[in-house]
Amino acid sequence: MDKDIGSAVAELQVCSTHYAMTIVSCGFHSPQSLMNADLQHCLLADQNYLLNNSNKNKGSIIEENTRKPFQSARNLQTSLKTHPESAITRYGLGYAGFGNGWTALKPKILFPSQKRRVKGRFTFPFSRRSNLAQSKLPVDLVPIRLEIDADRYKLRDSFTWNLYDKCISLDQFAEQICIDYDIPLHNVHIVQNISKSIQAQINDYEPRKAQSNLSFVSDVSSSTSETVYAHEPSDSLAKASKQQIPTVQNDLRILIKLDITIGRLNLIDQFEWNLFAPESSAEEFATVMCLDLGLSGEFCTAVAHSIREQCQMYIKYLSLIGYLFDGSEIEDEEVRSYILPPLKNTLRFSDMESSSFAPMIYELNDAEMERQDRGYDREARRMRRRQGRAKHGIMLPDLRDIPKIHRSLFPSSSVPSDDDFMHALSLSTNSDGETLNEINTNNPEREHLIVRLKVDSQKLKIIVEQSQTLTLNNFQQRKLTPLPNSMSFDSLNEFESERNTPSTYGQNISPLPQFSSPSLSSDAFLTNSNSSESALVHMQKLNLPDFTPSWVKRCVIETFAKFPNDRFNVIVKPALNPAERMTVRICCHDCINEYFTAGPGFTFGNFHIHLLSSSHQQKKEVRMNTVLDRNT
């Protein structure tokens, strides 16, 4: 647009010049003096008009330039929504998502029948007719606790089961549990134990079943604030008589105690709960509580299960002793001591301590988790052996034993655990007196990041030589005597040359010496002062072949210096292929027929783990005691 205005101004100037030349050609002697003032005024007015018009059009030009990319972006977004396959042609195959599925799709409802099936698993189909029939039945949740110990499997779980569930049988549910926990289905006894345990707990819930069909109907009366029970018809009680139950007072409070451990978190709390409050819902209370405390959904289900389980204990106890739930006084002294007295005031300050009724969350370490796990197993066995108090031939539940909930998270195959095996292995090779199984896994997080760099071969050799020099200096700081020239630590180039030398397999190799039981006088017990000298002596006694790599000699000396009372032999077998690494194995004299391959890397770390094991320590003590008895 600016170019058009400039060209128009230039044309006006050309026109004015042409007009002036025309006047000159007509015979006028001074064109500028003869220029008409009106013509100049018109030319200036036209020029100002064009300039003002250009300033007004700048805003429209900017708006037009902004609208074009915005409109193209909107068109691209619309095309991606309507035709997702066009994203592949525009952005490449990476936009398809591969295992994550398609992106930028319209949201849609995914029904269970449309879910992607996991390989090797199956689900039980539910028809619409069965779902419609199930929706018309009432919901009565039974707290279920599984404690299954079979073969090498230990299953502990807690959940709620709908008493009127008609969609799936207990056997099918038990099979689905085994599938979810990767328990092979050929273990039929585990499936049977799960279904029998659930069925037994449902049968124990029968006394509560009659009371679960009672609902509260408020008596709209200004004179009384009492509540009336009304009987609701259901499938199971359709033939029962619909007799009216007398009015009762809605105040039967108990003390709920929570002790829930999930993973590393332990929740401890206690609060009062009314057994027959019409607005009390264990699930809603657990949801609000976990939201306030910032806990996960696993705690939500555990809190609701614990509330229902403890309420069921009191309901079962009262039903078995013949209590009619008619608001009368409870005659049994034991259960009366657990029932809280009626409330007289809404606010209480004197009879209630806020510290004892406040939730507490503890984070457990590995030792505390293991100790709590053992205590939970011991308590579970004790509760199975213990029988409740019998009264009139009826076994009553023990209200003193409040069941705890202890859930250990199921290990995931995709999410790695916190333990690093290589880190534990490095700790085991550097620790004195700890085996690989005894390493404390509660180590602080490492602040270093492993970065892989591309280094030249020459630079890599220099780096390796420098690291070997550092190891040599650290080794000499242990007050070891200097090694002979024949046993000096060579560089990595020497090891490469030794590895590339032709194989000497089949040639005359010096036989390995046969060691007998060391006597007391022949350094059976070494002290720190002569440990370096004895390491060299043992090194010479091994009589290693000439083609033994230098790192093997170094590891032998380090092992003898670190474990002076242990006896072992090193077997070096050359490789048939010169490009391969020769085989180095270590034979322990105390443990018969036990051979260990050198490693990891150019170390004897695997053999050091064996020397630190308790079984080897016991055999070594037996040998040393035998030597002592023989010399005395």
Curated annotation (Swiss-Prot):
GO MF term set: transcription coregulator activity
Q: Which Gene Ontology BP annotations are present? A: chromatin remodeling; regulation of transcription by RNA polymerase II; transcription initiation-coupled chromatin remodeling
InterPro entries the record matches: SNF5 (IPR006939)
The terms describing its cellular component in GO are: chromatin; nuclear chromosome; nucleus; RSC-type complex; SWI/SNF complex
Asked whether the UniProt record includes Transcription regulation among its keywords, one would answer: yes
**Location of the protein in the cell:** Nucleus
Its quaternary organisation is:
Component of the SWI/SNF global transcription activator complex composed of at least arp9, arp42, snf5, snf22, snf30, sbf59, sol1, ssr1, ssr2, ssr3, ssr4 and tfg3.
Function of the protein = Component of the SWI/SNF complex, an ATP-dependent chromatin remodeling complex, required for the positive and negative regulation of gene expression of a large number of genes. It changes chromatin structure by altering DNA-histone contacts within a nucleosome, leading eventually to a change in nucleosome position, thus facilitating or repressing binding of gene-specific transcription factors.
> What name does this protein carry?
SWI/SNF chromatin-remodeling complex subunit snf5
Lineage, uppermost ranks: Eukaryota, Fungi, Dikarya, Ascomycota, Taphrinomycotina
